[in-house]
A protein has these predicted regions:
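Terminal low-complexity, poorly structured segments
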Residues: 2, 18-20, 33
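Generic detector of low-complexity/intrinsically disordered segments
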Residues: 8, 24-26, 101
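N-terminal secretory signal peptides that target proteins for export/translocation
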Residues: 1-11
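Bacterial Sec-dependent signal peptides at the C-terminal "C-region" and cleavage site
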Residues: 24-34
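Cell-envelope and extracellular/periplasmic
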Residues: 32-513
Length: 513
């Protein structure tokens, strides 16, 4: 009997001890919260040279955190919510360095370089990989640039701000470059070759994305112009919430629910990409951003005149680096060619993009009206796209004396039955491509009926446009089509920016959602 009681007592003691140990471990774990950083910080990363760089993460509330790189050391304490951040002093070009973050634990990142960092953003033509572009075998074989670093940010659509993402920095090699943005890589490669400094590229593009998905929702709600767009989404969101809570759905309802779930998590819902993608690295030290997007907003081109500048301005304010350079790619030529002049939503979107240069400082546009493919929305020539973007950065940020801006319409005057046009950024003059005859011009009178026009380059660089069918011209358009046939370049090899001299309402003027 005594032996049985002794055995039971021992068993109870063991159970109590185990429970006590588990409680102690749980308590210790609750108190201990390791220092953590989002994956925008990691081995092989590039820090922006010549400016302060923010480093941030989480730890236990009140925990002391020390961040060290080179001869710099910065101390801080985690706030009540566990968040902390420090600002590194400006670093010169160089490396490799070690970045050490020490709290109750220690995190160490190695092979950290200091150079030039650029965001590569937009939709599918920015996301488009080296593997899917022209000559991927040759491009990958040559991609031996140990000081060029890349990181891909995955596509997550949500209304909840994301602190981290699943990705890491990689060194540019023939094995790693294939899955990276082709436009981003060719842009970065040109900077690297021209400047001989480390380059860091952050690719967060999402194919098919709409501009409003990259913008904070409260900013959209603050402007009446976007009320119809937000109301449309509010209706869908309410329908999704109701259907999600319903029971015993039939097959059609299940299909509808799945489709709506895709919309709720997708790349068109306002603020979805801002929260799910951009927020995870917003504030990381950068030089600037390149952008290739607009196809998904072409049906609302007039709205884009305000939406696109709003997005750029909001990014700049939240990044806290002032008006950092923001360069974009104008939409390429695409779709079937038209035999006669016609209205075009793609032309109106290009116009909205060009207008943004007048709205915001430190912006620029790479015109690629000669690079597109009529039957493919994803032209495979990404080398020239990257180079034209690089021209802007090299000339404006790095002081390289090269042509960078496409010729652009400035003014027009009527001279009899002709219109004489003046342009900026022509440089050394004009060069028609392929044939001497200037193609792509259309002219109309006050009746707004456009016909193809003849054009002649004058000695002072102006261009004279006319048609025997229009006795009293009122407007001229150039390359005003989804897929225009046009052939005018500056002698520097940059195509004339598509334009119109009129302000007549276009086909997208009333489209708001």
């Amino acid at each position: 009997m005594m032996r049985k009681q002794w055995r039971e007592w021992c068993q109870r003691a063991v159970v109590i001890a185990v429970v006590g140990m588990l409680t102690l471990v749980t308590t210790v774990n609750a108190v201990r919260a390791d220092v953590k950083l989002p994956n925008i910080f990691g081995n092989h990363m590039v820090l922006q040279q010549g400016q302060k760089n923010k480093v941030w993460g989480t730890a236990a509330a009140g925990e002391a955190v020390t961040v060290t790189i080179g001869d710099q050391s910065h101390q801080t304490k985690a706030e009540a919510d566990g968040k902390w951040q420090v600002m590194l002093n400006a670093l010169p070009v160089g490396g490799p360095h070690e970045l050490t973050i020490k709290g109750q634990n220690e995190v160490k990142f190695t092979d950290v370089l200091v150079g030039e960092v650029w965001i590569c953003s937009g939709q599918s033509n920015m996301q488009w990989s080296v593997n899917a572009s022209n000559d991927p075998d040759l491009e990958k074989a040559a991609a031996k640039f140990p000081r060029l670093r890349m990181v891909n940010v995955p596509q997550v659509g949500t209304q909840e701000p994301q602190w981290n993402f699943n990705g890491q920095w990689q060194v540019c090699t023939p094995e790693t470059v294939g899955g990276f943005s082709a436009v981003g890589y060719f842009f970065g490669r040109q900077l690297h070759l021209s400047l001989d400094v480390p380059i860091g590229l952050i690719n967060n593009a999402w194919g098919g994305s709409a501009c409003e998905a990259w913008v904070r929702r409260d900013l959209l709600a603050a402007d009446e112009k976007y009320k119809p767009l937000l109301e449309s989404w509010a209706t869908r969101e309410a329908q999704f919430a109701e259907l999600s809570q319903a029971k015993d759905l039939n097959e059609d309802q299940k299909k509808t629910l799945n489709a709506m779930r895709g919309q709720m998590n997708g790349n068109h819902r306002p603020a979805n990409i801002y929260n799910g993608v951009l927020k995870s690295h917003l504030g990381y030290g950068i030089r600037g951003a390149i952008w290739y997007q607009g196809e998904s907003n072409a049906g609302r081109a007039y709205q884009y005149r305000d939406l696109f500048p709003l997005m750029i301005d909001s990014w700049r304010k939240e990044w806290g680096q002032g008006d950092f350079p923001f360069y974009w790619v104008q939409l390429a030529d695409f779709k079937a060619e038209k035999s006669e002049p016609a209205e075009s939503d793609w032309a109106e979107l290009r116009e909205a993009q060009t207008m943004t240069m007048d709205r915001l400082p430190n912006t620029g546009e790479a015109v690629i009206i000669d690079i597109g493919e009529g039957k493919d929305i994803h032209p495979k020539n990404k080398v020239d796209v990257g180079r034209r973007l690089a021209r802007w950065a090299l000339a404006k940020q790095y002081g390289v004396n090269i042509p960078y801006q496409s010729p652009r319409y400035k003014s027009a005057e009527v001279s009899g039955n002709k219109m004489v046009l003046t342009f900026d950024h022509v440089g050394g003059g004009w060069r028609p491509f392929d044939v001497a005859e200037l193609r792509g011009f259309a002219i109309a009178g006050e009746d707004k009926k456009f016909v193809w026009a003849k054009a002649k380059i004058l000695q002072d660089g102006k261009i004279e446009v006319w048609s025997d069918q229009v006795a009293a011209p009122a407007a001229v358009r150039y390359a005003w089509a989804d897929n225009p046939v046009c052939n005018l370049f500056s002698v520097n090899g940059l195509p004339l920016t598509p334009f119109r001299t009129d302000t007549w309402p276009g086909v997208t003027v009333n489209n708001t959602r």
